[in-house]
Amino acid sequence: MLQPKRMKFRKMFKGRNRGLANGTEVSFGTFGLKAVGRGRLTARQIESARRAMTRHVKRQGQIWIRVFPDKPITSKPLEVRMGKGKGNVEYWVCQIQPGKVLYEMDGVPESLAREAFALASAKLPIKTTFVTKTVM
């Protein structure tokens, strides 16, 4: 599972997920999976989608993960009264804005990449679209 090795502070404010994304172009591979909606991806969802893609392309080509879960999400245990401080860190998420490239792929035919990204997209809670690298 992806998570930061060290952080200056253990817990974080909830914050808001507004604005536009950085990393909107396919830069490493030839094909990419781009977010259309906004939301947040957990480390488990990122890993699950990666496994689905890797298995479908039978470990040929190369896959890049362009997102990293760097925000801790806390929760309190069940049946605990309010107060007594913020809960413990339960999992890590990555906030996604529209236009962000989530995954990239290279070294496979376009048809295979489309199928792999469709499988990965089914594992994710946000709408995505298939994009290719634009050459100027």
Curated annotation (Swiss-Prot):
SUPFAM superfamilies in alphabetical order: Ribosomal protein L16p/L10e
PROSITE patterns to which the protein is assigned, alphabetical: RIBOSOMAL_L16_1 (PS00586), RIBOSOMAL_L16_2 (PS00701)
Keyword Ribosomal protein recorded: yes
Keywords: Ribonucleoprotein, Ribosomal protein, RNA-binding, rRNA-binding, tRNA-binding
GO BP: translation
UniProt entry tagged with the keyword Ribosomal protein: yes
A Pfam family matched in the record: Ribosomal_L16
Cellular component terms (Gene Ontology): cytosolic large ribosomal subunit
Lineage: superkingdom: Bacteria
Gene Ontology molecular function: any one: structural constituent of ribosome
Subunit organization: Part of the 50S ribosomal subunit.
Similarity remark: Belongs to the universal ribosomal protein uL16 family.
Record's function text: Binds 23S rRNA and is also seen to make contacts with the A and possibly P site tRNAs.
Stated name of the protein: Large ribosomal subunit protein uL16
Encoding gene (name): rplP
